[in-house]
């Protein structure tokens, strides 16, 4: 992996930490991901946590739910930080794709990760319709 973009996994309770731990178990510790939880904070505190995680670097924020507080906070943050892109509906496949393509610019990395994430969602098993 390479130096490059920061990925911020922004999620409810311990979900962000679990995603980052899973990526580390699969891809190693040089992943560029930071876990941020919304637990116990209001919107201002969540924005402060996000700002500390991004630390003025080019970044992609991966939020858990498209319509949740994490996604709303990330979208508001990105509107005032042009070097930040937001992807919602985070899954492990998109995070793994991101960590191996941190050399891209935020827009390209976000688009690639979102496409990988969408493509990884399948229905397996059961009777054919």
What are these regions (language model features)?
Residues 1-129:
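N-terminal loops that bind phosphate or other acidic moieties
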């Amino acid at each position: 992996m390479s130096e490059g973009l920061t990925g911020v996994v922004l999620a409810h309770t311990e979900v962000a930490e679990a995603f980052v731990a899973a990526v580390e178990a699969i891809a190693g510790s040089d992943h560029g991901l930071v876990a941020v939880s919304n637990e116990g904070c209001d919107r201002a505190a969540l924005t402060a946590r996000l700002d500390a995680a991004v630390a003025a670097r080019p970044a992609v924020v991966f939020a858990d739910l498209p319509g949740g507080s994490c996604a709303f906070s990330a979208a508001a943050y990105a509107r005032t930080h042009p070097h930040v892109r937001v992807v919602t509906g985070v899954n492990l496949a998109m995070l793994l794709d991101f960590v191996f393509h941190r050399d891209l610019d935020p827009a390209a990395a976000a688009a690639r990760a979102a496409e990988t994430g969408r493509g990884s969602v399948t229905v397996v098993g059961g009777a054919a319709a």
